[in-house]
Amino acid sequence: MTSPAPDVLLARLRATGRAFSALGDQPGSDEAADPVTHVEHVPACEGRTSPWPSWAPVPVVDAFAGRGVARPWVHQVDAAELAWSGRSVVVATGTASGKSLAYQLPVLSALLADDRATALYLSPTKALAADQLRTLTELALPGVRPSAYDGDTPLDERDWVRAHSRFVLTNPDMVHRGILPNHARWASFLRRLRFVVIDECHTYRGVFGSHVAAVLRRLRRICARYGASPVFVLASATVSSPQTSAERLVGVPVDAVTDDGSPRGSTTFALWEPPLGPPRGENGAPVRRSAIAETADLLTDLVVSGARTLAFVRSRRAAEVVATSVRRSLDEVAPELANRVAAYRAGYLAEERRALERALLDGSLLGVAATNALELGVDVSGLDAVILAGYPGTLASLWQQSGRAGRSARDALAVLVARDDPLDTYLVHHPQAVFGRPVEATVLDPVNPYVLGPHLCCAAAELPLTPADVTLFGGPAAQAVVDGLVEEGLLRKRPAGWYWTSRQRPQADIRGTGGDPVSVVEATTGRLLGTVDAGASHGTVHPGAVYLHQGETYVVEHLDLDSSVALVRAEAPDWSTHARDITDLQVVSVTRTVDAGPVRLSLGTVDVTEQVVSYLRRRQPGGEIMDETPLDLPARELRTTAVFYTVTPEALEAAGIDAADVPGAAHAAEHAAIGLLPLVATCDRWDIGGLSTALHPDTGLPTVFVYDGHAGGAGFAERGFEAAETWLRATRDAISACGCDNGCPSCVQSPKCGNGNNPLDKAKAVRLLDLVLRALGNVEAGMTGGENVTGGENEARPDAGIADKVQPTGGRLPGKQRDAGSRATGVTGGRPPGDRRREIRPTGADVAGNDVAGNDVAGGGPAGVEVAAAGGGPTG
């Protein structure tokens, strides 16, 4: 069956969408509303080739020629030349641009030129590593012996890999847990290590990126111990400042290759907004048809049309739901196609994943609902269409996912289906924010003390730390952490360096937030189903929570926090659960500020107390709220970074916001700001939290806070401070553009609000944000010498606006004294060594609302990244 052209496919989908709206599900509007808000035609481009480098061995060139590569693209040769010359390089080009050849060419050439040389390849997902291993095996170059070393590798094969493989494909987890602690057994491999390849390096962001940066510094240190200094070759999606991001990740100078020479077919890219339904939501809000239900219908229509389609969803559960729904629909309209639809996600057995990948490659499958495990690099050729069930969090991921279709210069269709949240609403009504702005820079902090502490302990257990090592890990920032570890008795100073003091190996969870993971156990059989990160357990495996494991649904009966065990029973409910939290926040210190008259914008350190207090049950499909159940779980403490602004009561009154309206206005503005921060920072709304209050005791004014949901901060709040005008203007526009009357999940309601989304004042939130934006704009327009701003270094950022000239304050809030409290440190998490803080007390303020950051990512990794690895990660 030949698929119709992209424009024809889109016309069919639009007709179906109008028919659905005509059923009357969108009251008070055109009965035949068009769900497509914008169509962008991304043009095709010609490819540009280069001759093979003179140093490339004939067998390597012939092997690539055998796979249809007569001449490489220019960016492939540019990157390969730099790597071959001994310079670390990042190649940041578009999806399907052939980045793999850019590192395969120098690596394989080196392995053939020196029969003792070795290479290490790091992948964020198992699917991508398996795809690369398949390619390397098919090249069949003599003596290379590529091998996988991950959680799927049988124990009896690992010894062979260590002793004989010259090109090991693994992931950061296995380097951290398997290779570095056992470096003596890997000595032969490491002393001959020529190249380290880091594929899809843009996925290493936030706290997870900081962990990977520490693992790579530990790897460099161990390699140096054996006399090796490998060249790093990084492959990245098109991102802003790839050179800077790569250097922060690996800690060495890196050259960037960004001139993409590959051909590209045209893409018809549609922005799709499901219709608003009846007012069945919280507080009588209208409920928009879910992106999952809409995606299932679109995938059904495309499969019936003969279009090979990949639908990207945000969770493992959603992948199963979409695939099941599509098969059920096909049973009615085209039963012969029902078995040509499947789900693909992490958590499947290795054999199941490999079988699905083969079925995708040979065309046996027409439709696949996948998590982002298939986003990264897997060679799925010949696809006609891609559906994105919600904005994936970053433009880099959006272009990665949409680029899965139309590979090899084929024309393709891509459809972004908006979820019921402020960011998606903003994007489908502001297409320039999708198609007219550069891709984000990757945000990570390699000297986050909460990350450095555990890794410095791991490094000291591998080899005693020296002063040179402290410089490697971050200089003065690392030295402060080392001193704290010595004070805690975890490290001991000796003339030769710092030593790990315990006989047991230190632990560091590079994908979690610290603490022991919670084991999920089937109550009737005692079978271990999986684990959940400690930081996510209160929100994901609380009593009554729905837990999904490999397509099977369970309900949590009991959560034992002392034993870190959640007992579950098999059940098939027609509802989902959503935890709700409340927050208390204390300002510890302010590091950067912008004084804008009645408005003051600040960045600082805060202490947050979070508590899961209840959960909602929502009927599926549909999303209607069934009930809310209270929970009795302990509060958790977090020291992190927040961006916040205050507004004087006089300015609020002048803007038409009475004192009684302030809580609802601030609460609504906070919710929307959380939803829109991913527009300027590489984060997910579940990575951040917020609080708004009509009078905060630490500021003495109405205040809106947005904070990083990770100990020590992850760089997201800092990015919000730097791009405050861009961020808050988008927030204001998203609220204003929403078609509801008084607020809904598409604009100001939050799925994790512990105050029941009450009070919320949509109209007054727009007035509040207008006031803040006018004040910040006046500072920018009237700035002469930076007299209005303090904090941060004077570095040029294209969209930082007023934050460009700030200088560090290094101080605390005027008149605020901090009591010294208990000090704690942890090798697996907790506060950084030497961190003294007072006990958190309730503020007693009129808190308008709060939204607690959570870790709702499948696999416990960073937002949007499926766990790749060593095993032992969450499976739900």
Please place each PLM-identified region on the residue numbering.
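Helicase motor core with emphasis on the C-terminal RecA-like subdomain
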Residues: 2, 17-67, 71-90, 94-100, ...
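Structured, non-catalytic alpha/beta "coupling" segments that mediate domain-domain communication
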Residues: 3-36, 315, 550-559, 565, ...
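Extended Lys/Arg-rich polyanion-binding regions
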Residues: 412-414, 420-434, 445, 450, ...
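Short cysteine clusters
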Residues: 738-747
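Cys/His-rich metal-chelating microdomains
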Residues: 750
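Short Fe-S-cluster ligation motifs
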Residues: 769-782
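Long, intrinsically disordered low-complexity tandem-repeat segments
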Residues: 784, 790, 808-814, 828-833, ...
